[in-house]
Amino acid sequence: MSSSRFTAAHPWAILTAGACIQLLTGLPAAWGVFQQPVMEEYALAEEAAALAFSVLIAAYGVGCVLGGFLQDRRGPRCAALWGTALLEGGLAGAALLPSAWGWAMPWVFSIPAGLGTAFLYPAIQSCAQKWYQGRKGFATGIIGAAAGLSGAFLTLLVRTLAPRWGIRGAFWVLGGAALPVCLAGAAQIGRASCRERV
């Protein structure tokens, strides 16, 4: 059975792919657990760390609109792939940023990561809703639950990894985990072609 036919026969694969992506990309919801290690690693004052968070949130808001436009013009797979690239760029940028350059965190991490997570969200949400045309509330609930659980998951991840490998190690692990999940999810979304199904 081809992957396209598998998706057609098992529409739950769309929800699974979307939920897995959301679970790993809830950076705005989990910033609280990142803030203290980031302040220590990059020698940032609390105000500077708060600025990084504010820029992350602003980039997420702008990215939801831009991601929606991109999806309308190029399709959900394109939006998801761009989102993956931006998210990975932000995580790698934060991991590689010299400690003395902590002032650059909003530009190196917050903007690309905020845009990336936002590009992924509308692609996942709209495709899930269209595939579950008769059960939009259910589809939205699954994706929303994964987004909510993302904060708890990332909190556990950072609290486990940061004491051992530092916040840079946590950024690398998160990026390494998110890359295959987001790429596989984007491929699944692309194969689905957002057809109305259930």
Can you say where each PLM-predicted feature lies in the sequence?
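Hydrophobic core of transmembrane alpha-helices in multi-pass small-molecule transporters
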Residues: L23, G90, G102-F119
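Membrane-interface helix termini in secondary transporters
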Residues: P37, G68-F69, T160
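Pair of pore-lining "gating" transmembrane helices in MFS-fold secondary transporters
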Residues: A8-A30
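Residue-level signature of mid-helix packing/kink "hotspots" within the transmembrane helices
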Residues: A29, I57-V65, A152
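Intracellular juxtamembrane helix-capping segments at the cytosolic ends
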Residues: V38, A118-Y132, A139-T140
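Helix-loop-helix hairpin linking two adjacent transmembrane segments in secondary transporters
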Residues: I143-G190
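Core transmembrane helices of Major Facilitator Superfamily
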Residues: L27, P112-I124, A147-S150
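Conserved MFS/SLC helix-loop-helix module at the cytosolic interface between two early adjacent transmembrane helices
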Residues: V62-G102
